[in-house]
Amino acid sequence: MDTKKKYLVTGGAGFIGSNIAKTLEAQGHEVTVMDDFSKNGHFKNLIGFKGDVIAADCFKFMPRDMYFDAIFHEAAITDTTVMDQKAMMEQNVEAFKNVLAFAAENEVKKVIYASSAATYGNGPVPNVETQPTHPENVYGFSKVIMDNVARQFAEDNNDMTIIGLRYFNVYGPGEYFKGKMASMVFQLYNQMREGKRPRVFKFGEQQRDFVYVKDIVKINLCALNNGKETGVYNAATGIPRDYNAIIACLNKEMGLNLEPEYIDNPYPFFQLKTQADMTAAKEKLGYTPDYTLEAGIADYVKVLDAHYGRK
């Protein structure tokens, strides 16, 4: 029996999309990447990829008459500081509608898409998928609307399963081209490899649910293989860690002993803590994370050191 499947990954030259695409290909599947290479997508994220690449924006274009066993929709504006509401809604919501319409027209039965923890805003933690959404920016709002669109589309097309994954604070290989939106792990690593003291807001005690990108790939595959019904699920570890812990891990893995430099926080509404409730993802998708913060940073530093030629 042939177990080889065909998958489409939109935003497949970006951080998370490229990791999904290369993992699926390594498992022996036929993978097509779609990316317009205008935002976070970069060809270097696809070095070694053997599949097809469609250079297009799914807000403006979707291929015709192509069948896929499933679609992973990762294409989006991910910069949470973008204030252009029209552009955000077009690139995130309207493009998603195009992907769903394409899936329905071509009888694709499963779509897995990137939602976000930004849908929760400053809601009570740990965040549960059923709690009210309170987005603090247009990015988070666009993801709330995507979740609404997915739910309604699945009701109208009951032979489709549409699963949203609310990514928390993701870090790992492939984020080099995200610029200011790269993770704090990546930014602190770069400060420290230059011999600078790592700079964090006073006093480094703000907590985030940091999740390694390999675990994000894992939950996408769990959604593919185990997800039976439409819905949204948290994609995280469920264990919040503070910035001081990141610095300690980096010092250990880089063989350094740099003290943090604590700076004033200019943001009056800066979140003190993010944390996901992972019960639903475990029960419905069979997902449990493989990487603690220590294990994730240890793995990541090896990749970063090789990338920068650091010994």
Pin down the residues of each PLM region:
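N-terminal Rossmann-like NAD(P)+-binding domain of SDR-like oxidoreductases, especially those catalyzing
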Residues: 1-166
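Short, solvent-exposed loop/turn segments at secondary-structure boundaries
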Residues: 83-87, 138, 175-180, 272
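Short-chain dehydrogenase/reductase
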Residues: 89, 136-144, 179-186, 209-210, ...
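Structural element of the ATP-grasp superfamily
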Residues: 99, 150, 188, 281-282
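Short glycine/proline- and charge-enriched loop/turn segments
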Residues: 126-133, 171, 262-263, 278-280
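NAD(P)-dependent short-chain dehydrogenase/reductase
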Residues: 148-208, 213-218, 222, 248-251
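C-terminal substrate-binding subdomain of Rossmann-fold SDR/epimerase-dehydratase oxidoreductases
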Residues: 193-311
